[in-house]
Amino acid sequence: MAYAKTDLFDSKLKSAAVLFKALAHPARLAILKYLAETKVCITGDISDELPLSRTTVNQHLTELKNAGLIQGHVDGIKVNYCLDPVKVCELGKVFQELYDLINRSANYNCK
């Protein structure tokens, strides 16, 4: 029976990998930063805020939405985008757990 190599890892690691993959492009980080700074759901074209085409921005929005980091709600012909607070908290916990583990085991004592 065939299986994917990712099947060898537990679900917590696989979930973390999905989040990290979504963060692995500067455009997606810029989109998250923009949504966080505006603190409201954005109606309209986020591509006006980035040096990328509308099509490229939409592809990155899709990646972020598939990872659950943002929500997109259709309102007529526009989509309202905002951060997903539950997933953002989950992301923070994943980062904190990984940071604590690395810092503790390597004795870096980062401050």
Tell me the role of every PLM-derived stretch.
Residues 48, 65-66:
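Alpha-helical residues within the helix-turn-helix
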Residues 61-62:
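Short, hydrophobic-biased segments on the C-terminal half of alpha helices
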Residues 1-16, 36-37, 85-111:
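Amphipathic alpha-helical dimerization/coiled-coil segments
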Residues 11-53, 75-87:
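N-terminal helix-turn-helix DNA-binding core of bacterial DNA-binding proteins
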